[in-house]
Amino acid sequence: MTGKFSAYAIALACVTGAAPALAQEGIVTDAGQQADRGQVIATFYYSNSTRGYDADGNTIDIADYEKVELFLLAEYAIAPDFTLLFKPSFRSVSVEGGDDDRGLGYTDIGGRYRFAGDQDGWLAAEATVRIPGVSRDDNLAQVGSTDAEYDLRLRGFRNLTFGSDTGFVDAQASYRLRAGDPPNEFHADLTLGYRPDPDFLLMAQSLNTISDGAGRGIFDEYRYHNVQLSGVYTVAPAVALQLGVMGTLGGENALRERGMFGGVWVSF
């Protein structure tokens, strides 16, 4: 399919795609932060797309797509190696030629078990249930919050040193089971962090989603590869502010998003 009509279907399908990921997955920025019992990260995202990728990975004109999202990630360690995860989200989605969608997005509830390593490097397994939010049956653009999802994730973290500076690498891979018509998904995410100053952290993130084949109905197989670049500045002993940009570098049957985000990190 070509043209704006088929691209509109791409936009509808991509409402079910991944929200911005790794900034919401409980990034550990250094070994010292691991000593805290918990953290809360509130992140605001704005993105838009006037172009998309067809089934061959070529860029095409699509119906204008605009998205505003708010994520609230809460983590709390109930044991040295086990952390509870809770992440509600709110969204506003607008697709040219369709109705706007506003309301509660997915809410993730789960846990992370660290089965190997220490404060400087570890391996962990995560499992989360994603509970759908507000949806409307009369509008395909609302299918993004219609059915439950189940994410099974393997995660590795390692502190790094660069002379007198510090950093970290955080690698994650997951398989996401999705009820309903959309296909299941593979996820591969990588974050590199560099701290040139004790109060300032630079992060580069690669976020990759590949469908496990095609789903039913409008859901063809798809993939998309996003990057995020951001800085996090500590303004108080337990409070930091984040500001960054994001974009889609490539994909198939996907949006080409461009946007920005900001967040507040609080540890306790």
Model-derived segments and their meaning:
Residues 1-28, 32:
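Cleavable N-terminal export/targeting peptides
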Residues 23-178, 187, 191-268:
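Transmembrane beta-barrel domains of Gram-negative outer membranes and organellar outer membranes
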